[in-house]
Structures are given as C-alpha cells and as structure tokens.
Amino acid sequence: MAKAYWVVCYREIKDPNKLAAYAKLSLPAIQAGGGRVLARGTAVKAYESGQLERTVLIEFDSVEHAITVHDSRAYQEALKALGDGAVRDMRVVAGS
C-alpha cells in the first residue's frame, strides 16, 4: 500500500495565538492516527513563484489513514481552535 502525505502551505498567518492553539491540539491527533511530521517551517529556498511560506509535510501509511485523521473528532477540534487564524492550502497526496 502506498504512503500518503498531507501537504499544508500557510498563505498567511493572521493570529499566531490561534496557530499555537491549533498546533497544541493537532500534533497529538495526527500522531494518534499514525501520522509522522517529516518537515515543517519556512522554505529555505523558493523557485518558480518564489513564495517563502510556512509548509508542513506529514506522512501516513495510506490515503485512507490520511483522510481518516483529517476527519477525526480530535483533528476537527484542532481546526476549530485555528478558526480564522491562518489562510492555508491543504491537500492529501498519494505516494508513488
């Protein structure tokens, strides 16, 4: 079974306190579902459109696990804590 990844790009952080509250709740929810944070932070170097934005890469054992964790009660609580604190782009990508 192919691995799957959450790729999350933060276009804008509007409220660092809400982001901190989200981080406190989201990491345990992600880890409980078998997610592993592979990378997080601001890009070291950007090409193409040149956007040096915060990016997070999380690995799961399968697409099903990635979606289940996103839809879980615990992760949804983390998203509620984030609220309008950030503008993000999040996607689930299947590994090859």
Predicted regions and their residues:
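Short S/T/G/P-rich N-terminal loop/turn motif that feeds into the first structured element of a domain
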Residues: M1-R54, D61-I67, D71, A94-S96
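C-terminal structural segments of small proteins and small subunits
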Residues: V63-R91
